[in-house]
Design a protein with these regions (language model features):
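Ordered, amphipathic secondary-structure segments that act as subunit-interaction surfaces
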Residues: 101-137
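N-terminal beta-strand-loop-alpha-helix module at the start
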Residues: 1-65
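Class I SAM-dependent methyltransferase SAM-binding "motif I" and its flanking Rossmann-like core
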Residues: 146-163
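General beta-strand structural signal in soluble alpha/beta enzymes
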Residues: 7, 29-32, 50, 99-100, ...
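Short Gly/Thr/Asp-enriched flexible loops that form oxyanion-binding sites at enzyme active sites
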Residues: 136-146
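Glycine/small-residue-rich loop that forms an oxyanion/phosphate-binding "nest" at active or ligand-binding sites
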Residues: 59-67, 94-115
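Intrinsic disorder
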Residues: 70-73
Length: 163
């Protein structure tokens, strides 16, 4: 599998992130509220993972519409519901894998996205939107570095000051 870029729901420096995404061909995963970054910029991730508790009403509506369109809706996947959808912006048509997690879980949505990436063969994972204002979230995200390393993958927490 090619490299993976996960966009989480924290602070994202828009211009830096958009430029980075253009320059790096990678599998794109939105972790919960990270979906809103993609939708705001008319980009499509390859996968969306989360319990979607922090999505805006527009983000939730997008997922509801996709779920209604899906032929594979409500396929159980170990505590998750998973479906694939096709969505296009302009001329782009793309299949998006959506994994809905149960709200009662031990892992953060970002950690679940990272674990999914590793399970599917990713060895290098870059994560945006994890170096924001909340120190408790930042500390938890530092833990992802060790968790990934223990599973044979390398994680980089990316923002315009750290890459």
């Amino acid at each position: 599998m090619k490299d993976v870029i996960i966009v989480s729901g924290g602070n994202i420096q828009r211009d830096f992130a958009l430029d980075f995404l253009k320059k790096n061909e990678a599998c794109l995963i939105a972790a919960d509220k990270g979906l809103e970054f993609f939708l705001e910029h008319q980009l499509l991730p390859d996968a969306v993972i989360g319990d979607f508790d922090s999505l805006s009403e527009d983000g939730k509506k997008f997922l509801e519409i996709q779920e209604e369109k899906s032929m594979d809706s409500e396929i159980p996947y170990g505590g998750m519901n998973e479906w694939k959808v096709q969505k296009g912006f302009g001329n782009e048509i793309k299949e998006i894998k959506v994994i809905r997690l149960r709200p009662e879980k031990d892992d953060s949505d970002t950690q679940s996205a990272m674990n999914y990436a590793i399970r599917t063969g990713a060895k290098e994972i870059m994560i945006f939107g994890v170096t924001g204002n909340r120190v408790d979230h930042l500390m938890a995200n530092f833990g992802l570095l060790i968790l990934a390393q223990n599973q044979g993958a390398e994680v980089t927490l990316v923002d315009r000051y750290n890459y």
